[in-house]
Amino acid sequence: MKRIVLLIAFTLLTTSMYAEKIVGTFTMSGATRNIEAGIGSNGALNVFIQVVGEYSEYVMIRVEGEEDIRKFRTQLIHCKNKFIEWEQVAKSNNVYNIKKGIDVTFPDVEVWWVGLEWYSSYKNNFIKPIFLVNDGDASFGTIGTATHWANDFIDQEFYILFETANEIQSLIDALDISKIRHELNQAAETYNLFQ
């Protein structure tokens, strides 16, 4: 009986480890964050982006499907271009403090976070991203709030905050679908070696 339980536990562990694979990293506020990916039960590509949470350091947002991943990436490119433009305008005009919204809409995301257990929330969106200059230092960020799907009293704010255009670019690069698919295919090939 003990062997059967161990075998089942090992099988579940290895299957779940294969389901989401770290396919890249990016930099956010000076810290390295992970991008994980996997194929969902519906066959769609899922990308999990590690962000910062209000109560939990380990928060992942899930973008489902290539169409939404492309939309998310396109909006990031627009934000990066605005960041570069407005940072230059702020420096050229000696603007040391300003907060201005960037007119983009990110696709809805699922949010997963660790508290006493794993929590999740579906169909979450970000508040309009903002460009911020504080004491001459520019940053870009957005925030969202997730409420646990089964308990309205369990919630989590989640943040994306970049301090440079290069940090934004690192996430854009990490969300390249062809690179993500390549990483997943390599993992599948390695996994299939052991038949």
Model-assigned labels for residue ranges:
Residues 19-195:
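Positively charged, low-complexity terminal tracts
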Residues 3-17:
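Sec-dependent N-terminal signal peptides
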